[in-house]
Amino acid sequence: MALSSRLWRRLPPLRVCQQTRTWGSRGRCGAWGVRACEVIGNTRPFKRGFLFSALSYLGFETYQIISQAAVVHATAKVEEILAQADYLYESGETEKLYQLLIQYKESEDGELLWRLARASRDIAQLSKTSEEEKKVLVYEALDYAKRALEKKESSSAAHKWYAICISDVGDYEGIKVKIANAYVIKEHFEKAIELNPKDATSIHLMGIWCYTFAEMPWYQRRIAKVLFANPPSSTYEEALRYFHKAEEVDPNFYSKNLLLLGKTYLKLNNKKLAAFWLVKAKGYPAHTEEDKQIQTEAAQLLTGL
Protein backbone atom coordinates (compact mmCIF):
# COMPACT_ATOMS: atom_id res chain seq x y z
CA MET A 1 0.00 0.00 0.00
CA ALA A 2 2.84 2.40 0.85
CA LEU A 3 4.51 1.73 -2.48
CA SER A 4 1.24 2.20 -4.38
CA SER A 5 0.42 5.52 -2.74
CA ARG A 6 3.94 6.80 -3.33
CA LEU A 7 3.77 5.68 -6.94
CA TRP A 8 0.50 7.44 -7.56
CA ARG A 9 1.89 10.67 -6.17
CA ARG A 10 4.74 10.51 -8.69
CA LEU A 11 2.53 9.91 -11.73
CA PRO A 12 0.85 12.84 -13.56
CA PRO A 13 -2.86 13.27 -12.85
CA LEU A 14 -5.12 11.48 -15.31
CA ARG A 15 -7.69 13.72 -16.87
CA VAL A 16 -10.80 11.90 -18.05
CA CYS A 17 -12.96 13.83 -20.41
CA GLN A 18 -16.56 12.85 -20.40
CA GLN A 19 -18.61 12.98 -23.55
CA THR A 20 -19.81 16.52 -24.15
CA ARG A 21 -22.77 17.50 -26.14
CA THR A 22 -23.05 21.11 -27.15
CA TRP A 23 -26.05 21.79 -29.26
CA GLY A 24 -26.15 24.39 -31.89
CA SER A 25 -29.16 26.28 -33.05
CA ARG A 26 -30.29 23.19 -34.94
CA GLY A 27 -30.04 20.84 -31.94
CA ARG A 28 -27.05 18.80 -33.25
CA CYS A 29 -23.64 18.09 -31.79
CA GLY A 30 -21.26 20.97 -32.41
CA ALA A 31 -18.06 20.53 -34.41
CA TRP A 32 -15.87 20.80 -31.27
CA GLY A 33 -17.80 18.32 -29.11
CA VAL A 34 -15.57 15.26 -28.32
CA ARG A 35 -15.85 11.91 -26.57
CA ALA A 36 -13.71 10.47 -23.77
CA CYS A 37 -12.19 7.78 -25.99
CA GLU A 38 -10.97 10.47 -28.35
CA VAL A 39 -9.05 12.16 -25.52
CA ILE A 40 -7.62 9.02 -23.91
CA GLY A 41 -7.33 6.97 -27.02
CA ASN A 42 -6.77 3.22 -26.79
CA THR A 43 -6.53 2.31 -23.08
CA ARG A 44 -4.33 -0.77 -23.63
CA PRO A 45 -1.08 1.16 -24.34
CA PHE A 46 -1.80 3.31 -21.30
CA LYS A 47 -2.20 0.26 -19.07
CA ARG A 48 1.05 -1.21 -20.40
CA GLY A 49 2.84 2.11 -19.83
CA PHE A 50 1.43 2.40 -16.34
CA LEU A 51 2.52 -1.15 -15.50
CA PHE A 52 6.02 -0.50 -16.91
CA SER A 53 6.33 2.69 -14.81
CA ALA A 54 5.24 0.85 -11.69
CA LEU A 55 7.70 -1.98 -12.26
CA SER A 56 10.52 0.46 -13.05
CA TYR A 57 9.85 2.39 -9.88
CA LEU A 58 9.64 -0.82 -7.87
CA GLY A 59 12.96 -1.95 -9.36
CA PHE A 60 14.60 1.36 -8.48
CA GLU A 61 13.29 1.22 -4.92
CA THR A 62 14.52 -2.37 -4.56
CA TYR A 63 17.96 -1.43 -5.94
CA GLN A 64 18.26 1.42 -3.44
CA ILE A 65 17.30 -0.81 -0.53
CA ILE A 66 19.75 -3.54 -1.59
CA SER A 67 22.56 -1.01 -2.16
CA GLN A 68 22.04 0.59 1.23
CA ALA A 69 21.93 -2.82 2.90
CA ALA A 70 25.16 -3.83 1.14
CA VAL A 71 26.94 -0.69 2.36
CA VAL A 72 25.74 -1.24 5.92
CA HIS A 73 26.77 -4.91 5.77
CA ALA A 74 30.21 -4.06 4.34
CA THR A 75 30.78 -1.39 6.99
CA ALA A 76 29.73 -3.76 9.75
CA LYS A 77 32.06 -6.43 8.39
CA VAL A 78 35.06 -4.05 8.28
CA GLU A 79 34.36 -2.89 11.83
CA GLU A 80 34.20 -6.51 12.96
CA ILE A 81 37.55 -7.27 11.29
CA LEU A 82 39.16 -4.18 12.85
CA ALA A 83 37.90 -5.13 16.31
CA GLN A 84 39.29 -8.64 15.91
CA ALA A 85 42.59 -7.27 14.59
CA ASP A 86 42.95 -4.88 17.54
CA TYR A 87 42.27 -7.71 19.98
CA LEU A 88 44.95 -9.90 18.37
CA TYR A 89 47.43 -7.01 18.37
CA GLU A 90 46.86 -6.28 22.06
CA SER A 91 47.23 -10.01 22.77
CA GLY A 92 50.60 -10.14 20.98
CA GLU A 93 49.30 -12.67 18.42
CA THR A 94 51.55 -11.39 15.63
CA GLU A 95 51.18 -14.28 13.19
CA LYS A 96 47.43 -14.75 13.70
CA LEU A 97 46.94 -11.03 13.16
CA TYR A 98 48.89 -11.13 9.90
CA GLN A 99 46.94 -14.18 8.67
CA LEU A 100 43.67 -12.41 9.42
CA LEU A 101 44.54 -9.15 7.66
CA ILE A 102 46.41 -10.51 4.64
CA GLN A 103 43.09 -11.93 3.40
CA TYR A 104 41.98 -8.32 2.83
CA LYS A 105 45.11 -6.98 1.14
CA GLU A 106 43.01 -5.70 -1.79
CA SER A 107 40.78 -3.71 0.57
CA GLU A 108 40.09 -0.04 -0.07
CA ASP A 109 39.68 0.72 3.64
CA GLY A 110 42.44 2.94 5.03
CA GLU A 111 42.00 1.74 8.62
CA LEU A 112 42.40 -1.87 7.58
CA LEU A 113 45.38 -1.15 5.33
CA TRP A 114 47.54 0.61 7.92
CA ARG A 115 46.92 -2.27 10.30
CA LEU A 116 48.07 -4.66 7.59
CA ALA A 117 51.20 -2.54 7.07
CA ARG A 118 51.90 -2.78 10.80
CA ALA A 119 51.28 -6.53 10.86
CA SER A 120 53.55 -7.11 7.84
CA ARG A 121 56.32 -5.14 9.51
CA ASP A 122 55.88 -7.05 12.77
CA ILE A 123 56.28 -10.36 10.93
CA ALA A 124 59.40 -8.98 9.23
CA GLN A 125 60.85 -8.18 12.66
CA LEU A 126 60.52 -11.75 13.96
CA SER A 127 63.86 -13.50 14.46
CA LYS A 128 62.70 -16.58 12.56
CA THR A 129 61.91 -14.53 9.43
CA SER A 130 64.66 -14.97 6.84
CA GLU A 131 66.43 -11.93 5.37
CA GLU A 132 64.85 -12.60 1.99
CA GLU A 133 61.35 -12.82 3.47
CA LYS A 134 61.99 -9.75 5.60
CA LYS A 135 62.85 -7.63 2.58
CA VAL A 136 59.69 -8.70 0.76
CA LEU A 137 57.55 -7.97 3.81
CA VAL A 138 59.15 -4.55 4.35
CA TYR A 139 58.34 -3.43 0.80
CA GLU A 140 54.83 -4.88 1.01
CA ALA A 141 54.27 -3.03 4.28
CA LEU A 142 55.27 0.24 2.60
CA ASP A 143 52.79 -0.40 -0.21
CA TYR A 144 49.95 -1.05 2.26
CA ALA A 145 50.84 2.06 4.27
CA LYS A 146 50.97 4.20 1.14
CA ARG A 147 47.55 2.98 0.05
CA ALA A 148 46.18 3.57 3.55
CA LEU A 149 47.37 7.18 3.38
CA GLU A 150 45.84 7.64 -0.06
CA LYS A 151 42.49 6.33 1.19
CA LYS A 152 42.47 8.23 4.48
CA GLU A 153 44.85 11.18 4.63
CA SER A 154 43.27 12.37 7.87
CA SER A 155 44.43 9.23 9.70
CA SER A 156 47.21 9.83 12.23
CA ALA A 157 48.04 6.12 12.23
CA ALA A 158 48.37 6.03 8.43
CA HIS A 159 50.93 8.88 8.54
CA LYS A 160 52.80 7.18 11.37
CA TRP A 161 53.07 3.77 9.70
CA TYR A 162 53.90 5.27 6.33
CA ALA A 163 56.87 7.04 7.96
CA ILE A 164 57.95 3.86 9.76
CA CYS A 165 57.79 1.80 6.58
CA ILE A 166 59.77 4.38 4.58
CA SER A 167 62.44 4.21 7.27
CA ASP A 168 62.56 0.40 7.02
CA VAL A 169 62.91 0.46 3.23
CA GLY A 170 65.83 2.88 3.59
CA ASP A 171 67.90 0.01 5.03
CA TYR A 172 67.88 -1.56 1.56
CA GLU A 173 68.39 1.56 -0.54
CA GLY A 174 71.68 3.05 0.59
CA ILE A 175 72.78 5.98 2.70
CA LYS A 176 71.83 8.65 0.14
CA VAL A 177 68.21 7.49 -0.09
CA LYS A 178 68.02 6.96 3.65
CA ILE A 179 69.12 10.52 4.40
CA ALA A 180 66.82 11.94 1.71
CA ASN A 181 63.90 9.97 3.19
CA ALA A 182 64.60 11.45 6.61
CA TYR A 183 62.86 14.69 5.64
CA VAL A 184 59.74 12.80 4.53
CA ILE A 185 59.77 10.62 7.64
CA LYS A 186 59.95 13.62 9.95
CA GLU A 187 57.15 15.38 8.08
CA HIS A 188 54.80 12.41 8.49
CA PHE A 189 55.65 11.87 12.16
CA GLU A 190 54.93 15.54 12.82
CA LYS A 191 51.64 15.26 10.91
CA ALA A 192 50.70 12.16 12.93
CA ILE A 193 51.31 14.08 16.17
CA GLU A 194 49.34 17.07 14.89
CA LEU A 195 46.36 14.83 14.07
CA ASN A 196 46.58 12.97 17.37
CA PRO A 197 48.62 14.74 20.08
CA LYS A 198 47.76 11.96 22.55
CA ASP A 199 49.44 9.22 20.54
CA ALA A 200 52.49 8.35 22.60
CA THR A 201 53.90 6.12 19.86
CA SER A 202 54.16 8.94 17.31
CA ILE A 203 55.86 11.17 19.89
CA HIS A 204 58.24 8.32 20.75
CA LEU A 205 59.08 7.87 17.07
CA MET A 206 59.97 11.54 16.73
CA GLY A 207 62.33 10.92 19.64
CA ILE A 208 63.93 8.04 17.75
CA TRP A 209 64.31 10.28 14.69
CA CYS A 210 66.18 12.84 16.83
CA TYR A 211 68.26 10.16 18.57
CA THR A 212 69.26 8.60 15.23
CA PHE A 213 70.61 11.87 13.82
CA ALA A 214 72.20 12.86 17.13
CA GLU A 215 74.31 9.69 17.11
CA MET A 216 75.00 9.65 13.34
CA PRO A 217 78.64 8.60 12.75
CA TRP A 218 81.02 11.31 11.52
CA TYR A 219 81.46 9.71 8.08
CA GLN A 220 77.70 9.70 7.49
CA ARG A 221 77.51 13.34 8.54
CA ARG A 222 80.23 14.09 6.02
CA ILE A 223 78.32 12.29 3.25
CA ALA A 224 75.14 14.12 4.24
CA LYS A 225 76.86 17.50 3.99
CA VAL A 226 78.17 16.64 0.53
CA LEU A 227 74.77 15.47 -0.71
CA PHE A 228 72.50 18.03 0.92
CA ALA A 229 72.84 21.73 1.60
CA ASN A 230 70.96 21.35 4.91
CA PRO A 231 71.23 17.73 6.04
CA PRO A 232 68.90 16.57 8.82
CA SER A 233 70.33 16.92 12.31
CA SER A 234 69.28 16.80 15.95
CA THR A 235 70.57 16.47 19.53
CA TYR A 236 70.23 14.03 22.42
CA GLU A 237 68.50 16.75 24.42
CA GLU A 238 65.81 17.05 21.75
CA ALA A 239 65.38 13.26 21.66
CA LEU A 240 65.07 13.21 25.45
CA ARG A 241 62.24 15.77 25.36
CA TYR A 242 60.23 13.58 22.99
CA PHE A 243 60.82 10.40 25.03
CA HIS A 244 59.72 12.15 28.22
CA LYS A 245 56.68 13.66 26.46
CA ALA A 246 55.64 10.20 25.26
CA GLU A 247 55.94 8.91 28.82
CA GLU A 248 53.80 11.79 30.11
CA VAL A 249 51.08 11.07 27.56
CA ASP A 250 51.00 7.33 28.29
CA PRO A 251 53.21 6.07 31.15
CA ASN A 252 54.93 2.70 30.60
CA PHE A 253 53.25 2.28 27.21
CA TYR A 254 56.30 0.78 25.49
CA SER A 255 59.41 -0.99 26.72
CA LYS A 256 61.58 0.61 24.03
CA ASN A 257 60.72 4.12 25.21
CA LEU A 258 62.01 3.17 28.67
CA LEU A 259 65.17 1.70 27.15
CA LEU A 260 65.84 4.78 25.02
CA LEU A 261 65.37 7.10 27.97
CA GLY A 262 68.12 5.12 29.69
CA LYS A 263 70.37 5.11 26.62
CA THR A 264 69.89 8.84 26.02
CA TYR A 265 70.85 9.64 29.60
CA LEU A 266 73.94 7.47 29.10
CA LYS A 267 74.85 9.57 26.05
CA LEU A 268 74.48 12.66 28.24
CA ASN A 269 76.67 11.04 30.95
CA ASN A 270 73.90 10.96 33.53
CA LYS A 271 74.37 7.44 34.92
CA LYS A 272 71.95 7.85 37.80
CA LEU A 273 68.94 8.62 35.59
CA ALA A 274 70.17 6.14 32.99
CA ALA A 275 70.07 3.37 35.61
CA PHE A 276 66.59 4.43 36.74
CA TRP A 277 65.10 4.00 33.26
CA LEU A 278 67.10 0.90 32.37
CA VAL A 279 65.84 -0.87 35.50
CA LYS A 280 62.28 -0.05 34.41
CA ALA A 281 62.99 -1.39 30.91
CA LYS A 282 64.47 -4.60 32.32
CA GLY A 283 61.44 -5.19 34.53
CA TYR A 284 58.88 -4.44 31.82
CA PRO A 285 56.51 -7.44 31.24
CA ALA A 286 57.58 -9.28 28.09
CA HIS A 287 54.49 -9.54 25.88
CA THR A 288 56.38 -9.67 22.58
CA GLU A 289 59.69 -10.87 21.21
CA GLU A 290 60.84 -7.25 21.06
CA ASP A 291 60.11 -6.85 24.78
CA LYS A 292 62.38 -9.82 25.51
CA GLN A 293 65.18 -8.34 23.39
CA ILE A 294 64.83 -5.02 25.22
CA GLN A 295 64.99 -6.75 28.60
CA THR A 296 68.25 -8.40 27.54
CA GLU A 297 69.78 -5.15 26.24
CA ALA A 298 68.76 -3.23 29.36
CA ALA A 299 70.35 -5.90 31.58
CA GLN A 300 73.60 -5.73 29.59
CA LEU A 301 73.73 -1.93 29.84
CA LEU A 302 73.09 -2.06 33.59
CA THR A 303 75.96 -4.52 33.99
CA GLY A 304 78.29 -2.03 32.31
CA LEU A 305 77.39 0.86 34.61
Swiss-Prot record:
<dbReference type="GO" id="GO:0005739">
    <property type="term" value="C:mitochondrion"/>
</dbReference>
<protein>
    <recommendedName>
        <fullName>Regulator of microtubule dynamics protein 1</fullName>
    </recommendedName>
</protein>
<dbReference type="GO" id="GO:0097431">
    <property type="term" value="C:mitotic spindle pole"/>
</dbReference>
<keyword id="KW-0493">Microtubule</keyword>
<dbReference type="Pfam" id="PF21033">
    <property type="entry name" value="RMD1-3"/>
</dbReference>
<feature type="modified residue" description="N6-succinyllysine">
    <location>
        <position position="245"/>
    </location>
</feature>
<keyword id="KW-0963">Cytoplasm</keyword>
<dbReference type="GO" id="GO:0005876">
    <property type="term" value="C:spindle microtubule"/>
</dbReference>
<comment type="subunit">
    <text>Interacts with microtubules.</text>
</comment>
<dbReference type="GO" id="GO:0008017">
    <property type="term" value="F:microtubule binding"/>
</dbReference>
<feature type="repeat" description="TPR 2">
    <location>
        <begin position="217"/>
        <end position="253"/>
    </location>
</feature>
<keyword id="KW-0802">TPR repeat</keyword>
<comment type="similarity">
    <text>Belongs to the RMDN family.</text>
</comment>
<feature type="repeat" description="TPR 1">
    <location>
        <begin position="163"/>
        <end position="199"/>
    </location>
</feature>
<dbReference type="InterPro" id="IPR049039">
    <property type="entry name" value="RMD1-3_a_helical_rpt"/>
</dbReference>
<dbReference type="InterPro" id="IPR011990">
    <property type="entry name" value="TPR-like_helical_dom_sf"/>
</dbReference>
<keyword id="KW-0677">Repeat</keyword>
<feature type="modified residue" description="N6-succinyllysine">
    <location>
        <position position="160"/>
    </location>
</feature>
<keyword id="KW-0206">Cytoskeleton</keyword>
